[in-house]
């Protein structure tokens, strides 16, 4: 069952999917419809999940589940991956590749392979103050506090 993202407990489990490009406003509107329909019927072992999503910067899809109400199961997580794959096919983007880094350069959001980001760090094109998106955060609370952080405060720090 759909619950507004801001109404879920801060301890809710999240999954972040990033696109290598910014989605158009029209694509975001379509994604909103697909995700809302999915979440309305998302269940684990026939029990509806209290869940939500948010799309940030037209680039990141964040799914969330209130694990205190009922935890997501393997099958329900698989179902969420299938809807993400549906969006990938519809928009011709890659949302599941975790070997990429997304970071800010001023107000612009850039997307690089991990190898390219590592080279950029070595060449000092990015540094510990570069704002990165830490997609390894696990809860809404972590998302709010540690998702957009200086690289020095994230797993990205190993490159500096």
Identify the role of each PLM range.
Residues 66-95:
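Helix-adjacent hinge/juxtasegments
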Residues 22, 69-71, 104:
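Short histidine/acidic/glycine/proline-rich micro-motifs that form metal-
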Residues 45-52, 94-103:
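Short glycine-rich, low-complexity/disordered patches
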């Amino acid at each position: 069952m759909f619950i507004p993202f801001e109404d879920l407990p801060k301890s809710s489990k999240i999954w972040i999917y990033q696109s290598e490009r910014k989605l158009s406003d029209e694509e975001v509107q379509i994604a909103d419809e697909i995700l809302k329909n999915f979440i309305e019927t998302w269940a684990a072992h026939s029990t509806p999940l209290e869940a939500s999503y948010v799309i940030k910067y037209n680039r990141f899809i964040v799914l969330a589940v209130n694990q205190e109400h009922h935890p997501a199961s393997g099958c329900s997580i698989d179902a969420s991956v299938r809807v993400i794959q549906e969006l990938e096919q519809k928009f011709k983007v890659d949302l599941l590749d975790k070997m990429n880094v997304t970071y800010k350069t001023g107000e612009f959001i850039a997307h690089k392979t991990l190898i390219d980001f590592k080279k950029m760090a070595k060449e000092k094109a990015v540094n510990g103050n570069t704002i990165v998106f830490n997609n390894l955060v696990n809860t809404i609370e972590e998302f709010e506090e540690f998702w957009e952080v200086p690289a020095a405060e994230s797993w990205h720090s190993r490159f500096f």
